[in-house]
Amino acid sequence: MRPASHLALPSSLCVALAIAAAALVFPALASAQQPATPVLLDAMTTELHRAFTSLGKTAAAGDDKQLPPYFLSYAVSEATYVGIRAQFGALADSASNHVRSADVQVRLGDPKLDNTHGTHRASAVNSMELPLTDDREALERTLWLATNAGYGTALDNYLRVKTEAQVRAKEEDSSPDFSQQTPQTYIGKPAPPVVVDKAVWERRVTDLSKVFRDYPDVYQNVVMLTVQNETDYFASSEGSQVVTPHLATRLVAFAVTRAEDGMDLFRAQTFEAETVDGLPKQADLEAAMRELGKSLEALRKAPVTEPFDGPAILSGRAAAVFFHEVLGHRLEGQRQRGDEEGQTFTKEVGKDVLPTFLSVADDPTRTTFGSTWLSGSYEYDDEGQKARKVDLIDDGVLKTFLMSRLPIANFAESNGHGRAQSGRVPTGRQGNLIVTSTKTEPESELRKQLIEEAKKQGKPFGLYFEDISSGFAVTTRSSPQAFQVIPLVVYRVYVDGRPDELVRGVSIVGTPLAALKRILATGDKSEVFNGECGAESGTIPVSAVAPAMLVSEMETQKQAQGTSRPPILPIPGAEK
């Protein structure tokens, strides 16, 4: 569970870490020993037991106006963080904070039908800020208040659910509303408070943002450092007690320009580590900032591409985003249940959904890929279930889905993927989505095959997608089952031997079932996409790993284009 974002930039539904908010949940750290129960967890357990054994017990038998809960849980996120932000060589913000937030989940009825049924899932959770000190009485009173509020909401919604059940037609999927799971116990060592030399890092972040002064066409830039140490506490009426620490450091650089025709263009880059000591050296960071500035200068001069339908190569990172958007969201368990969901893959279990040389797993237990930290890692999910690797697709054949404790037809239990932002009910979500291939080629060979495929189709060029920022996946029945992915750096690869040409204004569009089966081959090296993903259970950190991919047909359309002119007044000092 992650608290609300801090020092956040605007983001789309699923946004690459390069432009995402900086406060994230990161991989859990294994404890060397089982420490004593923290005061906070002890207070949670005590008040939870008192509430669970008391609520609804004073009502007369059969009185729906007061019902005992069949399940009660407390999930508390405690985080300390430091955030530093600079732009154009000046410090814009420097802050430290300490927060504790509690999510109280109350379920009334029974696992087969409870207050969360159908469109009422949000009624399970009530959130409240907790005292920052280990004052047991203050903690227990605050949890008591949150529990009472949550119980009232749950009771109102349970009565609505029972009424609706009398008038609704038979549901396609009549699975229960909550799965039975084995209680979990793991008491990790709480994360220490963040300790950062703010003066040193304020200077370093400011110096990095100053690099963009050398690029007059960069109209906006932000460099942000966020260091967050978080501890998640979970206790339930089933007997689960889980404490897991999460440490994360992220440096984000973001820059924007505008072409003469009014099109806004941006580039971004992130650097991640467990602590600030793991970040690159300052000289390497400054070189990366200069590369961003140069790429924006080139992009604003690049031609706008026309709509295209032909062969393309996705770089490893671009392919990772592509799989996250096009496939990953549609394999989340709750997408297979509900009258409003498109259920693209619900009835495809046991069938080929990818070429036979591709397999896909989601493994939140993996913390790194090579030397890159995977931000979607965790030890226990936000329902207190142990994280586990899930083999979703094996040799092209769909095997299972990403499951929370919401059952679906033929899949009755969680597989450790119930995730949520504070204040939301956990749902099945991606962690570290990893794509592997048995049909690999060196990148140079993929390029040759791209040119051959373009010639075969009578195209003057193919496309190479080097970098992608974000995407949007539509999974509901009320809209077409389509996706849109926004590339940042795209090249035309000409069949006649001309140099590759940088272009702009491209969006990748299509439908998932068709797009996924057009993959012809993959590269022999994989790359990582780290990002934030938003859905009904909030914004959470995710990762995806994939090799470069050659696709026989990739459809693109023009991006929406602004009409605002570049700044009329030159930047200060330009006249000198």
Model-derived features: positions:
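N-terminal secretory signal peptides that target proteins for export/translocation
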Residues: 1-11
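Active-site bordering "gate/hinge" segments
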Residues: 29-380, 385-388, 394-397, 410, ...
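Short clusters of small/polar residues that mark proteolytic maturation junctions
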Residues: 267-269, 403, 504-505
